[in-house]
Amino acid sequence: DAEGDKAGRRYAAYDLTKADGQGKWWEGYDPQKLYGGYNMIVPDGISSVKEMNEWHDRHDGAWMERIPEMNPEFARNWYRRCKQLIDDYKPDLIYFDDETDLPMGKYGLMATAHFYNSNMKWHNGRNEAVANAKRLPEDKQRGVVMDCERGALAGISPRPWQTCMCIGNWHYDRGLYGYNGYKTAERVVKTFVDIVSKNGNLLLSIPVRGDGSIDEKEVAFLHDFKAWLDVHGVAIFGSRPWKIFGEGEVKMQNSKSFGDNEKLQASLSEKDIRFTQKDGILYAFVLGFPSQKTVTIRSLGRNSEQMKGRKIRSIRMLGTKKKVE
């Protein structure tokens, strides 16, 4: 604390040791190992937030997940904790929330390998595990599913990938609840369909309150999202990308940083079409209600590159038995 009532005092974790946990919920754990220990310690004598920020900018202002040069034991302990988590809880998916590549160098590879090998033992030799990491180099995309946080790709990827997004913030935000700041089901559906058309998957977060519950607005969102899936899920689950992901006005680039395609995804409209295919059926999603009640899909025109040697046998609209004219 640089300027507050307790200026000069350090946070509790600085002084706590394993012995201090006796009789507490964290008994048996050493805070110095959990929080990194005595590394890059802020010196005494800093008396303003400005001065504190300047110190951090000089010494630890960059987000990094590499092995700390002055504390390699931290990375080894991180691996042991990952291994225990895998062994104790047998997760189906592990998300490494790093800035780029797998975290902690060789220990990130070791943790991922242990996850995959353990999963195969749990499933009679079949690997059903999914590990996520961000902005992976090409060679690692063959073994780890790349995640674009609140982002997207420009086109179809030959390998499965993922977007993670949240209907609000990554933590529960009472302010967003108060002014109805959650994303609508319609907004999320646009992103969802765009992702699936490009061979991607959506990891969607519904923030929980401190007691583990969700509020009634989040429940309403889930009901709306489920209602859409009840009708359109047949064109999503088990589907594959078509020859092209779609057509329209919105043009995206491959995400290079957090959230850099989110506004473009929100702007998808009736003029944007996305395709999926399954069991010999082509599905076309119109990402907005047609104001003129007509839809033109140029990629399905008789003279289009995609339709050479092909004919449309019939057209149906999901959710209704009415004839499409």
PLM regions with names:
Residues D1-E325:
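Mature catalytic domains of secreted/periplasmic carbohydrate-active enzymes
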